[in-house]
Design a protein with these regions (language model features):
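Gly/Pro-rich, tryptophan- and cysteine-flecked surface segments typical
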Residues: 1-236
Length: 236
């Protein structure tokens, strides 16, 4: 199993022209059978999205298969944000490019390489983002996305800190159901209650919770440029 975080089409931080192009590389000596699922994200106060059917394809030995606009092409979705899970035998390497149309021509966006299960935050550890930024709707914004890859429930608390390491605002408790994806737009502001050019966010799974993936999407609201940040996992 591997997971692509922060994929989307026609919605999300990059706007209505967002699309995701996926590439799959099979370095093995035999063909690989690949099954891809898309987990539609919801807002923290929203209901879990309906499950989308998976898609299965073959990646020939030693070849790359490119899937442009994969969220629409494979899953028929016009407007959705979420995560993709990739199951393959033998294993493939997956990489996505998430882009949107640029007013000056071309496209801007970010790359998202597939992650393995050891990149999750589990109970006793925490996922730390030292690059959280919410500096105004027209300057910089950061969106937090949490993915539960398991069949059990997850419960996490999101905490905010200033540049001096002092806790700010009120911790945000979030329930992330089985195979669920939750979005928190302007995440630092949502927790801290105020914006900041530089801040820190921590995602802390509760005792007994399932492990979760976390990703932070930071976007320059003037240029449209963005990056998808994975956290530093502080072990227990």
């Amino acid at each position: 199993y591997q997971w692509i975080l922060a994929a989307g089409r026609g919605a999300g931080s990059l706007g209505e022209s967002t699309r995701t192009d996926l590439q799959l590389f099979n370095g093995a000596a035999t063909d690989s059978t690949v099954t891809i699922g898309f987990r539609v994200a919801r807002l923290a106060d929203g209901s879990p999205a309906a499950q989308v059917p998976t898609a299965t394809l073959t990646v020939p030995a030693g070849k790359v298969v490119s899937l442009p606009d994969v969220v629409k092409g494979l899953f028929g979705l016009d407007a959705a944000v979420g995560s993709m899970d990739v199951v393959s035998d033998p294993p493939v390497f997956a990489f996505a490019r998430v882009t949107a149309a640029d007013s000056g021509g071309g496209r801007h966006g970010y790359g998202s390489a597939a992650l393995l299960g050891d990149s999750t935050a589990a109970p006793g550890s925490r996922a730390v983002f030292i690059q959280a930024t919410d500096a105004g709707w027209d300057v910089m914004e950061s969106e937090l996305q949490l993915t539960n890859p398991t069949d059990g429930a997850a419960q996490v608390t999101v905490k905010a800190f200033d540049t001096e390491g002092a806790a700010v605002g009120s911790p945000l408790a979030l329930a992330v159901g089985p195979k669920d994806v939750v979005r928190v737009p302007t995440a630092y502001y949502a927790v801290a209650g105020t914006g900041a050019p530089i801040g820190r966010l921590e995602v802390v799974p509760a005792e007994g919770s399932q492990a979760v993936f976390a990703a932070l999407l930071r976007q320059d609201k003037k240029t449209g440029d963005a990056d998808a940040v994975v956290p530093y996992i502080v072990p227990s």
